[in-house]
Structures are given as structure tokens and as C-alpha cells.
Amino acid sequence: FHSGSSLPVVTSQGWTFGVGICFDVRFPEIFRVAAQHGAELFFVAVGGSGHVDQIKPSGDQKHQAKFHVKEMMQLVSARSIDNGMYTFIANQSGKSGNAWFPGYCLAVAPNGKLIGEHSTGEEGMLITEITKQIVKKAKTSAECTVTAVRPDIYANPVIVE
């Protein structure tokens, strides 16, 4: 895997969205910058195969899916709430080399609640309904901190000894 050199924010079919991969979900800044540039949605393609001690030689994808769904929900819920946007996760499915991928999809609303899930450990598709009204409401809520960011303070912290 190689790191990218840009953060795409795309407008298509009336929606503005950010795009990221796997490890990007651990960086709140990526979601924040996309939201500041108008993103209402964020899509993340994941290639997570679980921790080594949790991967069974039989390729038990259901066990891996359970682990990944729990971890991703913690991260993605916060990203959605902070930025007032929908977030969608899709993980690779099946075997690649010696690794098994759990094949799950998650759809998280701007309030951080799960609105759709496919986590059977098998290939599948997730279909859910989204609305701009929910995004507009979320972006004006107290939980959404996109407009409360203070880069003037973050750039020059006061070090107290």
C-alpha cells in the first residue's frame, strides 16, 4: 500500500463527498477537511483482515467481520457526528494470498447511528436511503463541530511547564 498525495472531494449527482481508504479512517483531519469543503458523504474502501491472533486458518470471515464492524463503528460514528455527514464503509471480501477479508458494509448517519449493515462475512450489497435534509440538520446541531474549528489556537499552543 502507498499513501496518496491528495484528498479528493467530488460532486456528483447533486451530492458532495470525500473519498478515503482503510487507514484514513483513523485520521479525523481527513474527514474534517472534506466537510469544510462541502462534503455531505464520505466513502471509505477498506482492506482489513483482522488481527493475526483473530484470523482462523479456516478463514472464518464471520469472526473477522464482527471484530472489524465493532472497531469501525467506534471510529466512523465519531467522524460522522463531528462533521455532520453520512459515512459509508465497504470492506474487501474473500481470500487474497494468505489473508481472508471479512466482507462487510456499513452506512452511518450524520448522528452517528448505524442505518445499514451487511456483515455476514460473505459478499453482498447494502442499500439504504439518505436525505440532504438530515445532513442540513446535522450540520447545524451542537454536535457538529465543523464551523467551531479554531486553527488560530491549534497552530500556536501555549506550552505550560
Language model features with spans:
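CN hydrolase (nitrilase-like) catalytic-core segments centered on the catalytic cysteine
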Residues: 16, 25-125
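Glycine-centered loop/turn motifs
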Residues: 1-4, 103
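Cysteine/selenocysteine-centered motifs that mediate thiol-based redox chemistry or coordinate metal-sulfur cofactors
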Residues: 2, 8-37, 44-46, 135-161
